[in-house]
């Protein structure tokens, strides 16, 4: 696939593609230039652009367009330094590298973890031990721990893959990995004191699988045990030893708890005999021992008989309470209705007054009771026709029907009855059947005389303003 693209693809790890840029502040290491062109960096799938007609993606601007000046002004440009000058740090690093290479030539099967490269490491473990205390990495990851001087220090021996690809007959296929046995060769100071106490063949699985197995190496107390212990600020509950917890101690506690209850029952039982008599006459002397009325001795009291008497008294009290409840229920049933409501709430009440009944309304209206004479039904009111005179006893009866006195002619002339028939026949009356002709022939005074009205207008075309 790579034959299609011309040119040579160079790796990014063989040379530094960036140019050193002098620092603006003295004392800082040199960094990258402010603007780096990535046109020269060709990846695996980014071929070089060899066609002159197509512009590159990240290349310069087209030649037809005006190009702006990319030069930095003089007052912003940092002062240039001559290349080739080394500072003290460069000299120290070069010296340490040279010394390390010389030592590796003399002792090539050992790795040199220099403490002077890392003078102080953060954390409670301190610096690394000298390089002579650490063995070759091949012995950490191989089954036999053999040393191969000519082999790559980061590759394992061919025998290391034996237990995984072709397990032997004398090795358990589900056994422990053999790499932990090689890790036990580390000294106590390796990795800040985390070496052999935990990475030996017998102590890795010693706590869970074989607590009684003898340790392979004599080591100080396990430093990892401090992580599983409770801190001093929270003291753990101290369990009493087995010698202090005797078999009888657990059985004695319930007995101690039952003793106060037993004594309380005895006190309650002796309470009626220990109380003094409340209704004792002052003239009656107290009974002595051996006389009548004296308190019986404690030994003569029979507990069983007393309990039987108490049970009989309780049964009698329960029977009396049941009889009283039955009597109360019977009395309540006698004073309650079918729905269980009290009869006082359901007593009959007078029905609401809805007016006289239909026969009473047809018979007529009764006279008031305060009128003289026996009560009787009066005639219904009579409606007179127009022109009928209210004269004679009928007018008086109609006036008395509503308990009204006849109107006085001097006070209420309009409501007064017509004059007696002794008057002259030509006198006009208010309700006379034959009114005088003068009243009928004269026009009413409030109605104006008819005027000639204008002739009606003929319907024409509708006006535009409407």
Curated annotation (Swiss-Prot):
The modification Phosphoserine is found at residue 281. It comes from the Eukaryota. The modification Asymmetric dimethylarginine is found at residues 229, 239. It comes from Mus musculus. Residues 442-459 have a biased composition (Pro residues). The lineage of its organism: Eukaryota, Metazoa, Chordata, Craniata, Vertebrata. One of its GO terms (biological process) is positive regulation of fibroblast proliferation. One of its GO terms (molecular function) is growth factor activity. One of its GO terms (cellular component) is extracellular space. Keywords: Isopeptide bond, Methylation, Phosphoprotein, Ubl conjugation. There is a cross-link at residue 8 (Glycyl lysine isopeptide (Lys-Gly) (interchain with G-Cter in SUMO2)). InterPro entries: AUTS2. PANTHER family: FIBROSIN, FIBROSIN FAMILY MEMBER. This is Probable fibrosin-1. It holds the Pfam family Auts2. Residues 248-272, 288-311 have a biased composition (Basic and acidic residues). Residues 236-315, 410-466 are annotated as: Disordered.
């Amino acid at each position: 696939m790579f034959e299609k693209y011309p040119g040579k693809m160079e790796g990014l790890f063989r040379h530094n593609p960036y140019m050193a840029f002098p620092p603006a502040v003295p004392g800082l290491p040199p960094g990258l230039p402010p603007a780096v062109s990535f046109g020269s960096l060709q990846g695996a799938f980014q071929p070089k652009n060899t066609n002159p007609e197509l512009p590159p993606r990240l290349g310069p601007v087209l030649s037809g367009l005006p190009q702006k000046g990319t030069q930095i002004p003089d007052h912003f440009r940092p002062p240039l330094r001559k290349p080739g000058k080394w500072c003290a740090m460069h000299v120290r690093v070069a010296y340490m590298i040279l010394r390390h290479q010389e030592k590796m030539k003399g002792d090539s099967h050992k790795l040199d973890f220099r403490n002077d490269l890392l003078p102080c490491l953060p954390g409670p473990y301190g610096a690394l031990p000298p390089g002579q205390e650490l063995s070759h990495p091949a012995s950490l990851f191989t089954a036999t721990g053999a040393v191969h001087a000519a082999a790559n220090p980061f590759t394992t021996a061919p025998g290391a893959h034996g237990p995984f690809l072709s397990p032997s007959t004398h090795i358990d296929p589900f056994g422990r990995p053999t790499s932990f046995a090689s890790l036990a060769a580390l000294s106590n100071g390796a990795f800040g004191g985390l070496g052999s106490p935990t990475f030996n063949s017998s102590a890795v699985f010693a706590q869970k699988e074989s607590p009684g197995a003898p340790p392979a190496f004599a080591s100080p107390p396990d430093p990892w045990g401090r992580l599983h212990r409770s801190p001093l600020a929270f003291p753990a509950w101290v369990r009493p030893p087995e010698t202090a917890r005797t078999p009888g101690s657990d059985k004695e506690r319930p007995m101690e708890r039952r003793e106060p209850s037993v004594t309380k029952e005895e006190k309650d039982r002796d309470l009626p005999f220990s109380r003094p008599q409340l209704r004792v006459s002052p003239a009656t002397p107290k009974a002595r021992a051996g006389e009548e009325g004296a308190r019986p001795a404690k030994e003569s009291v029979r507990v069983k008989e007393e309990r039987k008497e108490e049970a009989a008294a309780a049964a009698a009290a329960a029977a009396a309470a049941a009889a009283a409840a039955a009597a109360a229920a019977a009395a309540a049933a006698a004073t309650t209705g079918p729905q269980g409501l009290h009869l006082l709430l359901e007593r009959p009440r007078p029905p609401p007054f809805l007016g006289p009944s239909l026969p009473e309304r047809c018979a007529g209206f009764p006279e008031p009771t305060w009128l003289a004479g026996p009560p009787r039904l009066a005639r219904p009111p009579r409606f007179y026709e127009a022109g009928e005179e209210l004269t004679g006893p009928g007018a008086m009866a109609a006036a008395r029907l509503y308990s009204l006195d006849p109107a006085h002619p001097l006070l209420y002339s309009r409501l007064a009855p017509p004059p007696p028939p002794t008057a002259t026949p030509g006198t006009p009356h208010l309700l006379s059947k034959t009114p005088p002709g003068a009243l009928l022939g004269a026009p009413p005074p409030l109605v104006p005389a008819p005027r000639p009205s204008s002739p009606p207008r003929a319907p024409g075309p509708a006006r535009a303003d409407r």
